[in-house]
């Protein structure tokens, strides 16, 4: 699946975005998915659902679970597919001792990512080594199911897609998107039958309210080349 990597370089904490994007999506190795599975995606039988087109510009929130840490992390997200850039802002939901909060600005046209500590504005500038790949459903994805989330009078219909192919009976990526408007709901990555990364998206609003969020602060003019640690081990 050409380019299922969303933003693959910075730190595991962004998982679905930093390891889960552009050509890697978190160790799952979803690049080069290959031919469409029979009955799925572009090669499906008449009446088989086809991948919808996800919004190109939106803002929302995400909760990311990483198996490696056993933790959930929350962040605000600004996604600009038209200009190939993403901004992720860590959210603090509880007092966690020795936890540093960061802002990440990923500019794929420039091939760089800025990591900015929220408290001090200290900045790191890191080269992005993977090409841009949009957050959407690949055209050769396999349709798995359609169902409703919620209950009577309060439900939304979603479709579930995967990278499963006829040559194997399991998948390493599962994406859930709404039928109406094709909003991302959840993306999950597995390895050796275990979930290694799962991201939930919510509170999505179309458009970018303030495009300046993609402009690094002035402190990034003297950015260091090394990634900063999330904990207090400076």
Each PLM stretch: what is its role?
Residues 74-140, 189-198, 203:
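An acidic-aromatic
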Residues 73-74, 100-101, 161, 171-173:
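Eukaryotic intrinsically disordered and solvent-exposed regulatory patches
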Residues 2-4, 12-15, 29, 57-59, ...:
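N-terminal entry/capping and adjacent linker segments that precede and initiate structured domains
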Residues 38-72, 84-89, 113:
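A short, Trp-centered hydrophobic/proline-enriched beta-strand micro-motif
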Residues 2-17, 21-49, 128, 134, ...:
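Non-transmembrane domains of secretory- and envelope-associated proteins
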Residues 60-66, 87-93, 157-168, 175, ...:
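Short beta-strand segments that buttress and anchor functional surface loops
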